[in-house]
Swiss-Prot record:
Organism per entry: Arabidopsis thaliana
Function: Mediates the regulation of male germ cell division by DUO1.
Chief place of localization: nucleus
Region feature Disordered, mapped onto this chain: 1-64, 95-119
Organism classification: Eukaryota, Viridiplantae, Streptophyta, Embryophyta, Tracheophyta
Pfam family, one: zf-C2H2_6
Any GO BP: pollen sperm cell differentiation
Subunit structure: Interacts (via the EAR motif) with TPL.
Zinc finger (C2H2-type): 65-87, 148-170, 211-233
Tissue expression remark: Expressed exclusively in pollen.
UniProt keywords, alphabetically: Metal-binding, Nucleus, Repeat, Transcription, Transcription regulation, Zinc, Zinc-finger
Compositionally biased tracts (Low complexity): 106-115
PANTHER family: ZINC FINGER PROTEIN ZAT2-RELATED
SUPFAM superfamilies xref list: beta-beta-alpha zinc fingers (SSF57667)
Name of the protein in question: Zinc finger protein ZAT2
Length: 270
């Protein structure tokens, strides 16, 4: 009996029964999550949150003040102070001008308006401006209009293009070079003939851009070209004079020179 009592731990507990069970406790309990249905999720997401309602400030009407320079109204003093930077020409600082500033401006304006008196010079300037405004506008009749006349039928046209189109109707005349401008300068005079006494030839003085040689009658466009051409005739004349033994550029010899030359020739002949 002693062995059985020592081995059983519940032997000392009175009223202990073998049918009593102790509750079991879990060391790591887990919380259950409740799943929301689709209807509950849609209703919760679509429902708007209430926005805070801002009530108007009863003192806002007292804060809003107009600008003393331009009259614009602003809802806050901060905006009004920022707007006053747009008026740097004012002589005072802040929102409201000083009390004596308005009276001084009014007095200056009244004194300036009463003391202003137009001078005689200003009266003259005003009268001149009125005369210029009421004067007649000068017409363009005094201007000379350029006109072009057709040589074939003597019709007058106001432009060179109109005359060119008209000249196309004349089949006997090619081009429009026969037209004449009424306002152009008169034609140059005909060439004059001058007789050269040394050579007995007539020299023509041709006016205009054409330059004619008086020896071979060749025409050149410029005086420089004619001068270069004339050197050919001068060189030919010099060659002919050298062949004849007479140089026109050297002065004639005296009687003493001729006798000396003859004596020298005689001596050389011996």
């Amino acid at each position: 009996m002693s062995n059985t009592s020592n081995s059983d731990p519940n032997s000392d507990i009175p009223f202990a029964s073998s049918n009593v069970t102790l509750p079991s406790y879990n060391q790591n309990p887990r919380r259950k999550r409740t799943k929301l249905t689709n209807n509950e999720v849609g209703s919760s997401s679509s429902s708007p949150r209430p926005k805070p309602v801002t009530q108007p400030d009863p003192d806002a009407s007292q804060i809003a003040r107009p600008c003393t320079e331009c009259g614009k109204q602003f809802g806050s003093l901060k905006a009004l102070f920022g707007h006053m930077r747009c008026h740097p020409e004012r002589q005072w600082r802040g929102i409201n001008p000083p009390s004596n500033f308005k009276r001084r401006i009014n007095s200056n304006a009244a004194s300036s308006s009463s003391s202003w008196d137009p001078s005689e010079e200003e009266h003259n300037i005003a009268s001149c401006l009125l005369m210029m405004a009421n004067g007649d506008v000068p017409t363009r009749s005094s201007e000379v209009e350029e006109r072009f006349e057709c040589d074939g039928c003597k019709k007058v046209f106001g432009s060179h293009q109109a005359l060119g189109g008209h000249r196309a109707t004349h089949k006997d005349v090619k081009g429009c070079f026969a037209n004449k401008n009424i306002t152009e300068d008169p034609p140059p005079p005909p060439p004059q003939e001058i007789v050269d006494q040394d050579k007995g030839k007539s020299v023509k003085l041709v006016s205009g851009m054409n330059h004619r040689c008086n020896i071979c009658s060749r025409v050149f466009s410029s005086g420089q070209a004619l001068g270069g051409h004339m050197r050919c005739h001068w060189e030919k004349d010099q060659e002919e004079n050298q062949v004849r033994g007479i140089d026109l550029n050297v002065p004639a010899a005296t009687s003493s020179d001729t006798t000396l030359g003859c004596s020298l020739d005689l001596r050389l002949g011996l």
